[in-house]
Structures are given as C-alpha cells and as structure tokens.
Amino acid sequence: MSPFFHLAVILSLAASLACAQSSVASGELHGTVADPSGALVPAAIITVENSVTGLTRTVPTDEAGEYRVPSLPPGEYKVKIQKRGFRTQVSSDLRITVGQIAVLESKLEPGVDNEIVLVTSQAPMVESERSHQAETLQQEWIQNLPINRRDYLTYTLLAPGVVDATALADNADFRVKQTPHSGLSFYGSNGRGNSVTVDGGEMNDTTGGVRENVSQDAVEEFQINRSNYSAELGGATGGVINIVTRSGTNQFHGGLFGYFRNDALDAGNPFARVLEGNTLTRIKPSSRREQFGANLGGPIRRDRTFFFAAFEGLIRNESSVVSLLTDPSIFGPTPDQEALLRTLPAATAGPLRALLTSPQSTIDLFQRNSGVFPFATHDWKFSVRIDHQLGSKGQLFLRHSYAHLHEQNANLQALVGATRGTEVSLADPTTIAGWTQTLTPRLINDLRAQWNYHNLLTDSVEKYGPEIRIQGYGVFNHDWVLPTRWLERRYDLKDHLTWQRGTHSFKFGAQALIRGIHAENKVFFAGRFTFGDLPGSVLGIPGLPDSFTLNALQTFNLGLAQTFLYGAGNPVIAQTYPYYGFFAQDSWKLRPNLTIDVGVRYELDTHKAPLRTDTNNFAPRIAFAWNPSADKKTTVRGGYGIFYAPIYFQIDYVVQALNVINGNRQIAQVFSTILDTTAANSANVFSTLRAQNVIGVPTPARSITTADLAQFGMNFTHSGPLPPFTLIFENARDFVNPYSQQSSLSVERQFGQNWALSLEYAYVRTLKITRLRDSNLKPAPVDPALGIRVWSDPVRDFVDPLIAQRNIFESSGRAFYSGLIVELRRRLSRSLSLDANYTLSRAVDEVTDYTIDYEPTDQTNMNADRALSSFHEKHKFVAYAMWTAPGNLQFTPIFRANSGRPFNLLVGYDLNGDRHDTTDRPAGAGRNTGIGPDFWSLDLRVGRSFKLRETTALDFTAEAFNLFNHLNYASINNVVGNITGPFNLTGRADRTPSQPLGFTSAFDSRRIQLGARVRF
C-alpha cells in the first residue's frame, strides 16, 4: 500500500476516535487519606493531573477514606487532596507505569483549604498491591541500554525466567521459516503461546509470532507479565507483554538519530573461511549497518489535543557465515575406511577408494554453498498518534502505524548452504482507535477497536529444487516448504468496564477478534531428498566387514537417497475464524494490608472442520498481595491460574490441504524410501532425474514436475484410491487448545530508600501441547541387537502398509518448569541505577515444536521423549546498570551469562525402519542428552551529552556488543551416527563443523556501533 493511503487513514480518523486505555496500556492509583491521628477521612476530593498533558481525573474518598483512580496513561502526575477543615495537600512527581498499581498514603494537616502543603516524598519501590509476577521497563532504560538491533522486545530477555527461543544448540533446527514464533521462551515454553499488545491492541500473528510494529523511539514503556496475570489478559500460556507508545505533551519535543556500523571496527568470525585451491583461508565478513530515524511530538491544542510521530529505518548490508566446508578431508575416505582400505587387495581397494571419494561436482556444490555470503535487510517503521481530551471525563486517542520489511538471502548459518537462503517481504499497517470515559467517579468504560493487515511472502532465493539434505554435512537448494504467502486481516474489538464499590474493584470485559486469512503454502512442491548413513553392503562388494558404513556424503555421491518427498495441487486455503474472550475480575482489599485478586476468563477459539472448536476453555485465576509489615516495605505475593493459548492457523492449513477429506486431497503427496522395491525407490528417482538433468549438481537445473515423476508410477490425482506411500496429515478427534497451570510465590523487601530485593519460586505445568505423531505404526518388536523397536516388516508392522505416514496432530504434549528467582534492584540515586537477577531452573518437555521432523523417535511410546527441554537453561544471570560519571559521561552496561542448553543426538538415518529419517536417536539414547556450550557476554554503551541551547542537546554514543570478544559457540553438529553410550556429550572445539559434535556456528563476536542524536 502506498504512503498516501496511510496518510489518508490518519487524516480521516484523526477527528474521530482512538484507542482505549485499559490496564494493559495504563496504570492505577490507589490511596488512603487520614487525619493526624490516623483516622481515615471520607469524602475528600482527589484530583489527579498529568504533569505534561494536563489530563485531570477527580474522585472522592469512600467511607473508609480510600480511593482508586484506574486507567491512567503512564506518566508523571501530581495529586491534590482537598477537604474542608484541612490544608490542601499536593504530591508531585508521582510516576505511574503500565500495569502498575501505585499506592499513595496521605495525612492531612488541620487548617483552611486555601493553604497548600507540598509533599515530595519518594514513592515506595515495592508495589504493595500487585499480586502477579511482572517487570516494567521505562523509557530511561529503553533509550539508553545497549540493545543490538533497537528491538525493544529484546529487552524482555533481560527479565528473569525468560530465554531466547531462537537459539537452539542443535545444528539441525527443524523449525520452518513460514511459522515464526515470538523468539521468547517464558518459563521453558517453545516461543509460542505468548501474547504482545501495543496500546492494548494485539500484535500477534497466526503462528505464535509477533508482527512488526512501531519504532523504539515511539515506545513510552512496556510491562513484562511473566505469570499469574489477571483474567483481563488472555490468549497465552506463557508471557504477556504490554507496550505503550508515547504521546505528545504541551511542549514540542523531538529528535533525530543515527547509528552506524562498519566491519573495520568489528572482530572477525572464527568460522569465516573459504577454500582456495586446497587451502582454507580465513576472511573477514563485510558488514555495513545504518539505523536512523526521527520523532516529533507536541500540542495541537494546549491541554486538549496532542500528537506524536516517529519514523525509523534500518539498512543492513552484512554477511552470513556458512561453515559447510572447513575440512577438505571430508571428500575422501574416513580414517576408519582408510584403515580398512590398507588391508584389502589392490584390486578391491582401488575401485572402493574411488567410490568413497567425492567427485568434483560434489566439491563444487560445497564450495558454492560454503563461506561468507551477503545478506540485506531493509526495515521501515512509521507511526502517528493523536490524543484528545474530552474535558475531565473522557479521553480519545488514535494511532496508525506501518511497517515494511524486506530481507534478502536470510536464514543462512552453520550447515545451511547459500542456495537454501530465503527472501522475506512484509507489509503490516495497523490502525487502533478507542475511547476511555468516566461515567461516574466510580465507573469507567474503555472501548478499543483495531484493524490490521498482514501481508507476508517468504520464498527461497534459489528458485529451483529439490531440497537436498545430507545429514550432518549440509542442506542445499530450494526450501521444501516454500514459497508461502500469508494475507491476514484482523479486526479486534474490546470493551472493559471498571466499577469501584467499597473495598472491591470489579472489572468486566469482552473481546471479539475476527481473523481472516488467505494462505498459499506450496509445501512439498519443491521436493526433498534426504541422504544418511548406509551399511557398506549396499555396494555389493564381497569381503567387507559388517561394521563397514557409508557416511551421508558418500551416499549422496552414489545417489543413494534414503527418502524422497514431493507434493502437488492447490496450495490455497482461505477462511475466517473468530476468537471471543470474556472475563470478570475482582480486586478485593480484604484488609488494609491484604489484597485478593479473583477472576475467571472464558475463551472461544473457533475453527472449521476437520478441526473442532474447543468450547470449555474456562480459566479461573486467584492471586494475593500481603504486606506483613506496617511500613509496607515487604510484600508477599502469589497465585494460581489456568491460561489458554490459541490453536495456530498453520495446523488448520495442514489438516485441510494435506488431508483426505470426503475422498479428496487438495495437495497430493508421495513419499518413497530406498527400501521400496518398485521404480519409485527414492535412490532410483534421484539417480534417474539427475541423469536426465532435472536435478543439477552443483547448480539446480530446474524444478521437478509431476510429469517428471510419472515415469516412476507416482500418481498425483486428487480423488479416488490413494496411491502407494501417500503422506496424510490429520488431527485427532479430541484435539484441543493447549493450556498451562501457573503458580508462584514471592517475597519482596525494600531496604533503605533505594534498594529492593525479591525472592520468587515459579512452577508452570503446560498440558495439551500440540505435537505430531505417526499413527500408521503398530508396536513393533524390540530388536535384541539394538535394544529398540524396529519396524522391519513392511506389512505387519504398519496399520496400512500402503500409506507411508499418517501424521496426526495431537494434544498430548506436556511441559514442566520450576524456577527459583532472585532479583536485586536499585533505583536512580547518586547517578546510579541497577538491576540484577539470577534464575535457577529446570525445564522439562516432550516435544520441541509441531513439525514433522520433531516427531518422537518411538512413535508408539511418546513418554520416551520426556527430557530436558531444548529451552532449558539451568543457570541464567543478567545485570544491567546506568551510571552518570563526572563530565556528563554515561555508562550503561549489560552483562549476561547462562549455562548451556541440551541438544538432541541424531543418527542421521532411519535406524528403526519407521519411515522417518530425521527423528532417530542412537539406540538407547534419550532425547536432549547432549549439553551445549555456556554463554557470557558484556555489552557497553558510553555516551556524552552536549547542551547546544536551553532546550536542545546533542548526544554521542559508542556501543560495544560482546566487548571482550568472548567466543560463544552457538550450535553443534548433532548428527553423530549410531554411537554407544554414555550420551551426556558436549560440543568439541577440536572438531570441524562437518564432524560429529563439532561446533558449527558462534554468536556474534565484538561489534562496535557509533551513534548521534539531536534532542529538542
């Protein structure tokens, strides 16, 4: 859509409505008023005024001398208290943050009400009435901490109990590009099941990811709700992040900024090597990054109407490092094979050596795909917000935002070849509007409406297929599940009503989210060949020992593909599926030092056949906040609740497009193996198509078509009898929404004026997690030599021998998390503020994600996959600070350290004969028994501000990410063959990426960024 369209939207809506300030985008003020004797004062008049916008709210105290002011936009406030017979008291500099329940206790002095008493006491650090576990990051942190990409969601990783869901230790990361997740693992979750809101409007997509939204400069602050949040928040089994954007004020303010990087200042990458002749040469990847933007805010009409606009652009021209080829010896016999060759007669050894040695075409394939490759990112964000006050009883605001992203040659890393890169194009406009109205001093209504359009296109840079997966060595060519295009239109309407009655604060609300989607996903259309280890007996050479094995690279050279997968048909699914949510919540101040929060939420996540709608998603929640000490500097909080996540549309798509419904197949698929005795044998298909120049090595010749496959008897009709070795994807009849049971208990204590220490225990039990299982397998007998089930009989071991796989989505996965959290905070005092937290945790689950490659090793024993989660970090420590030194120098460091994550050992071929070649572990090995490398890094920003005029300043900053250039290995080659135990293995720095347990990639080495900002 053109920029003129978005400008038209802003101008046409500016005179109408805007977003409501519900508690997901606002805070509350609770207070008591007493006389000098401590007796509570009823009917006092409380006036709360925003210091920069003039927003005013007036409420009386009740019979108990208490008052509540909900739905306050984040900001600085002054509170005026008036009562006949007492002096008027004014408290200033009271900060209200998003999701906060601020408490103000006041004592009035006798006198006449035209006498004013100014109170400037500091607010307590401990939120004495907050019952759930949460953190709030204010603008001071957002603007000054060194964050690598100015992505404010990355700040969430600073919170305890949250880890990076994008960083698996397994080199074989089977999650697919078109089903992104949030990147945030709350309490051991897999990155899905979280929810993000901006100004109260949801910013999630249909797969559990987060949509592009606004510039970091447009963010006022955000709250991270880790667990036990109220019934007002829903659609998540993990965390909920509430982001609030900045508004204009009575003063014009704005700025320009730019941040710049160049590889001349950066450290090199240890995996950046290219093969020149027979020599590996280290090179330094090129890198250029410019990130720039501007913002402007101010009054349209003083004390009445305001605006704030922000723009941000990111241009990256950098390099990805692919470590496919760091050891040329992989193209010859292995050391064990060399030892055998020396014992064989020359007449046998010579031809065998030739078979074990890669041809030039294979060497060219690796050279073409390994090394350093450019990638580019262009990311643009723009937003305008308008606020309008309807006197003292109503507020309107409107925000329109637009995000555009284009990535070229992304997704390259480790053993993912250059021809497997992806191209992403995204357009995402959002308009949100609403109205907050004070109906009576004790009754407030919030109405909010949002419209979003999400257009995402993901394709492979290499337009031809098929995908070639050489287990443990590399993945090449067109991604087998691309291209894909998702068009979403989401209409979100919410209404919340807050009613104050005595010691109760009731909230009631409803939401209707209409999700319309047009999905075009050419899954399997490119085809995929998989190569793994095979016994040497396939060569037919007499005299070879039974232990002689061909590795995956050698089977590729010989054209011995273990499996082949292909699909064709109509890739389009379009439908509308609404979501409805309803809640009721009561915050009851049972005693002056005890608050009980009780609520229930009901969610109706509708779906169309063959999925069914789960109609019993009731989510009760209860929590408390208790202040055992009279000074209210100690708060004990805890709670329990049930939380539901949606079923993501990718599952709707698969069970409609890749299923057999009423005898029809929208996308017909075939699957063949090397064990097939017909012409459709996967090795025969590969060798024949390669000889016919349909498959080119090293350069793909063209895409495979159904006409090419007809010669093998492969049938792609979409009705009638199923052809042999069809793949089917279905959902279980009892397939339902995942849910979590969250419980926590914490104690927080303020020490002195500026320090606070908290101790928390959290336990989360997540059930009904989506997973895939092949239901076509019968329980097979245990092979006495291997000690595992082996499906060796192609007839008796399968429910339907003519079906290759019947993959069924089930609600059978489970996850368990327990964690102990210690957090120390110091608020700004003597130029220093600090936050440090430590998490000791254990995360256990049974599945990593819901793709076919994460199915269990033993499909008839799902419990055998219960193990430490891929997102388990036993120890995590984070500390960050802000210090202003003499000379107006500001230092803001972030130190992060965590223990290594588990990784899954894979054989690299179909060891147990179940027709799955990416799920097998070494015989006897449990899931995720390997332990990845530890991580630590120090980031630092140094800045200095120069005053140009009274209201204008120039800031210069220098940032170093991974200041000490510590080598943090990221992923491990987890294809190890059928090794014997023990299996508690770690990565090996003395091995190359193409060797088992060799490290395949590293996190960023030291990066330097220089920046400048003008503020006025």
Residue ranges: model-predicted function:
Residues S182, T237-G239, E290-A294, W380-V384, ...:
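Hydrophobic, lipid-facing positions within transmembrane beta-strands of outer-membrane proteins
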Residues A710-H718, N888-T951, D955, F961, ...:
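Extracytoplasmic gating/loop element in the C-terminal half of outer-membrane beta-barrel translocons
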Residues K80, F86-S247, N262, D266, ...:
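Periplasmic N-terminal accessory/gating domains of Gram-negative outer-membrane beta-barrel systems
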Residues N968-F1016:
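C-terminal beta-signal and terminal closure region of outer-membrane beta-barrel proteins
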Residues Y152, P345, D614, A619, ...:
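Solvent-exposed loop/turn elements at secondary-structure boundaries
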Residues S2-Q138, D217:
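Periplasm-facing N-terminal accessory domains of Gram-negative outer-membrane beta-barrel systems
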Residues R591, N754, S758-Q890, I894-N898:
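Gram-negative outer-membrane beta-barrel transporters
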